[in-house]
Amino acid sequence: MYIIFAYLYVITAMSLVETPERSSMLGAIIGDMAGSIYEFKNIKSRDFEFLSEACEPTDDSILTCAIARALIDVKGRGTHLQRATVYRMKEYFLCNPLPLGGFGGKFFNWAIYNLEEPYGSWGNGAAMRISPVAYVGNSEMEVKLLSQIITGTTHDDPEGLKGGEVTALAVFKALHGATKEEIQEMVRSYYPGEYSVEELHKTYKFEPSCQKTVPEGMQCFFESEDYESAIRNVMYIGGDCDTLGAIVGAVAGAYYGIPEWIQEKALSMMPDYMVEDYEDFKAMYMDK
């Protein structure tokens, strides 16, 4: 009898423990904000104030929200997604042309001159903004297709398309219960090689390409214990910290969930339109 009561007590206590909300979109925005002040001034340390008052969303978060809004517009259907993505990214750029760190030069010209064709980019912007598609696709094949459509609006170089696809698949797998080993196996199938956070801490520098950002960022996730430690690993290796933060934050947010105190702090720092985008996307796709 005592064993039964003890068992029931443990089960009840566990049910009262609030599980961190798993969110790749919010995880990406928070990771971007956390790294925003270290993009051009790396600290190569895990010891820093998480989301200090100086942190703010950069182009990474702005375009993540633009893609989320485009996916809301088309209600999960691939029809007109390319057109909606182009429209929303240009709209969000024009409404927020000078974020902390600025937009990439090629994207800036594409948006400001209202160009229609993609510009052949292999840059890590393809991976920083793609996380919302993981909630919309119902299978890995659908996630790949959505990623290709969205990424191809600007980053039609094979390396750009690959970087967006790997990130989207990693988030999808994390949301659907894959282990780190399974996610790592997928990432290594795209980017063969061995990495370690300690080695990256010693040697890694700012890199704008997908092929020199995505696998390094994924290693920060693989060697983490929770959402916060994954983001701290990003600042420890340095590099393009806001973009790495967005990529790592998306996967870690989907895999671990995000502690409530971090969510509340981030939401209080985000502009109103960004909170609205997140809440609308959450209502349509995350809470279904």
Where do the protein language model's features map onto the residues?
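Structured, active/binding-site neighborhoods that engage oxygen-rich ligands
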Residues: F5, T12-K288
